């Protein structure tokens, strides 16, 4: 018998609440924008007020539940953006959130020694991107508030605490803190000492698909959910998206959203002496996810489209781009040269002078999407250089793949089929559904629909290949 689930999916820019069946059918969905505040004591620091976010989340849940009063909800789960933590005080109050876009620790990274050791044990560079550095930076300028921290957790497990009152963390999120030893699968006392973070603030680790318990009476009464509904632990958004697409050991998958991680799954931990990748724990911590990442990609096009093509559908824009036989400018807006651990601070459009006479707005759109395709392709090349892969296909998922032009461009550059399965644009939500089904003993039936396949162009001289050659030169000029 089918069950119905409530899924909370917290992203970086936007979040959503979905009512979904155990077969993956989305009954209803509510989206909202995430709001951040600046901390002017730092050069680049942002935070959020958990109470403000919580109100939006619960309002979204209630709106959906009220609209579908005849739907019995059996389970609740959550997906969260990585590298973000929520901090609790001694009374269990969530008083501040430090998001992935917060870089408050940057000024003090030179104080951290044994960087190679930290990379080897955590699978991550020793940079301000991760919660260990965020907490260090918080301690530097807000010592009294830092001393109030009695527990932390990730975004996805913060939702679990809202619904059950219990604070835990999933392995796929624990490794994102840079305080978790992915060899020994436990919190690292040595790394905590390096960052001067007390071990006591770190929560119990529980695996995805395990039950955190029944939802509290308070939440049940407030939202109108059945008191027997259980909260089932979710995890990191990238890993959940990969789960939805049935990414197996040896597959390569591009998860295109705010950023576009290029990932592969391995049975054993991978360590790169040149530090050209991140090694993550997969859901449950039983396998490893190796990742390269071009940085911000999807957000760039989302903002561009809102500014220049707000009333144009993706289908209409693809029709415009299909008529283009050449490019007149290149774009550079992706934010990372990943293999060199280098942020790309300068971006823009590069074209020949004087200003081209035959240029229109669609040329800019082509340039931005081509920038995303080329940036992903470079990361695909880097990943295959480290971990050889002879598959004739790549899997893809995420909202970033709404553009057919982008899909064709990636297939042409890589020379591989790009395959996307039903629900690819809602992959994190469907990943949660699969976890819930596993917990309730419901078979996760493989999709009977054929995948959407983009085949590479056999022509040796495609537009995107010509673009790539010039793009590479121009990006290096902008970021020497």
Model-derived features: where do they sit?
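Short, acidic/turn-prone active-site loops that include or flank metal/cofactor-
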Residues: 32, 37, 99-105, 174, ...
